[in-house]
Amino acid sequence: MYVYTMENVPPSTNYLYNPKIVYNDHDIEFNVNYMPPLELDLGMAEINDIDNSINNFTNDTIIINPHTNFNSRIDGIYNINGKPIQSITDLYNLINTIFYDLIDVIIKSTLPIFNEHILYRVIGSKSLELYTNPVINNVKILTYDIEIVGTNNEIVLFLEKITMQLNAYINYKYGPNRYFIRNILRKYNLIDETCNWHYENESNNMFKFGFIKTTNSYQPCIFIHLILKKNLFTTGLVNNSNQTNNNHNVIYYPCVKFYSSKIKYKPITIANINYGRLPLIINKLLDEINTRYYNKELLDNLLNVNYFICNPIIQQQYCSENIKNCFDKNFSSAYYTDKYLSDFIPTKTNIKIVKDILNQYYGTYLFEFIKTHNCRSVFDSVLNPFNTNDKKQFINKIVDIVRNVDENNDRSLYRYTQEDHIPINLYCQMRNVGLLNDPKILDLIENFHQTKNDVDNLDNIYGILSGITEYTNSIDHLFKDEFDVVSVQTFLYFNAPNGQIIDSSNLTMDIGSIIYMPNFLSTSYVFFKDIHKFLSPVKVLYKIKIKKDIMRPLNWILVDKYSQLSNEKEILIKSGSFFVIESIEYLPVEKINESEYYNIKVITMRLCYDMDDAISHASNFGTEKLLYGYVNSNNIIGGSSNSQIKKISGPIKNITIINTNTLIIDPELFRTTSLNNYNDILNSYVSIYALLCPLLTNIYNKISFIHKKITLNYNSQKNSEKNLPIFDIPNIYSDSESHLDNLFYNKYRKYKTKYIYHKYKSN
């Protein structure tokens, strides 16, 4: 890939000038001559970089090949899976992973601003996420492909304006995201202190627009501009633009590619983002199948029923009133195959392939997938936790017991069901991260002492209820051995090693991951009437499996009618609970009073009794799993994350649990309005980041092994289990490094790249 940035354009010309040059690409010599970029009319005006830094322009535009001779590495550069970075391609793949969430959210926050001004459509791989499950799909692409309908001048103007808006998000309104970029790069040992100026100085635009030099043309594109440390590669510096820089490696990573079209039609709009329709998406993937190695895999996934998710477009047009409409004798896949072929100008070579793929997709979806999946609405399913028809009597008895216990504890539970749930959960969140003594917290929690008292009382109530025989017997009689509850939430992630910032868009969290929630979690055992008011495309529906066991202390309370909102049918899960992710899927939601569907992310988790139980259950999904959300003051100053965790009791399979020291925060604790779009998400993320910034500075590269257990074979007849020590890394010369077992080294170094680098350097 070859990149022009606007800094390369001579200010005295109205066109791109490129002298004839010679360069080597994989030992093959090419002659490159100037070609107009996609036949754009650049006579409109001088095209400058949006920061108007014309002093950086040069008269000669030089293209280099970033892949040539850069296949060596220094020790200490590893990808998210612990494998060494050995080439520029490996580096691009890592950038794609760790910046996926941030770029995705920022672009989705920016595009709605331009909905009324220019007709655009998101096409290609990003649009395919509407049709195939992006979680189980191992092809996750950071780069957006956007088709624009308009004149060449309008396209260039749009390119400039959207770049300016992206920089506004990064630089001003959402300044802390620059530090997010810096910290995640530093976590993977890609930058050092000599690079900080680029990320901390707002005058250095992180987003720039220019062109990618392809075989036959120049393609308009927006890049994220990354400055990496000088000694990243042993063979020299890499710079995929024409700029000369002898101090650092320079990467312009494409995050938005633009294409022109003269075909106008109303796009599909979901969450205020305009998308192209499926024929156009397939055609674009076919057009670039030779230059994008993952396009074939994306198309294969579109034909694999195991990757399918409910199609909201078909849903709202044909299946909303009666699911049988989807199988009417007059309805066939050919209807969709032929209807939208006019969305693009087909070539003779790909029209047949597009039609074949469409026929296979719609045929499989309509006559195989939808027969085994309830694709009407996630809320059409029935939740029923009870195993008796005489539930009213037992519910009333349980509620009376809960009321009596609560009245002896200053009615803290009832206050929680009112507006006090916000300060109570905020207290729990800040207790987890060790910030209760921060003066800013006292400003956020007005009645701090009452809130502390309520939290203590609530913790006591769970224990008291578990000791009341009448209560536990009623629970045992009323509830099934296992049942489901639901909760609509949005959680923000800080310091996640995979670059995650929000649970609704992130695609890299593994099945079997352990989630620690420091706050109380309100759930419902029915889909109550007003649940739609809490929904938006940026929310997640958590489906939580609860296993009843009255022989253990219960970490959930049936609140039911003893609540401010009695129709919620509430079950309140205790603060400090552990969950294990069992599945992630996307299911349709129908907007109230609107005939519009969209898919919402549904995360199914199992509520565990304690850390031991969570580790045991996580072992069913693999041998190496991550723990999210567990951070406290002990972790910040060094030492074990929890002294009680050192003693893991009971039989546990071979498994490594790594504490990522990721903070999970409920943003609605800091807001008076609900979260409805990605702009709301970024506003919340930044406001919370400002509060957590000192804490994140201390823990951003800290990691702990919570539990490690292996089986050692001393001889063929005897096996002996050995608990390895818990590893915590208070500094770069941690003694715990010498105790590492080779079995876990790859996973360990994934989070220890900075330390390994310093040791290498010191030698």
Curated annotation (Swiss-Prot):
Name the UniProt key words of this record, in alphabetical order: Membrane, Transmembrane, Transmembrane helix
Instruction: Specify where it is mainly localized.
Output: membrane
GO cellular component terms, alphabetically, are: membrane
Question: What PROSITE patterns does the record tag this protein with?
Answer: TR_MART
The highest taxon in the source lineage is: Viruses
Residue ranges spanning the membrane: these are: 684-700
Membrane topology label: Single-pass membrane protein
Q: Which residues form the TR mART core domain?
A: 380-607
Please state where this protein is localized: Membrane
Record-given protein name: Uncharacterized protein R390
Q: Which organism is it from?
A: Acanthamoeba polyphaga mimivirus
Task: Give the organism's phylogenetic lineage.
Answer: Viruses, Varidnaviria, Bamfordvirae, Nucleocytoviricota, Megaviricetes
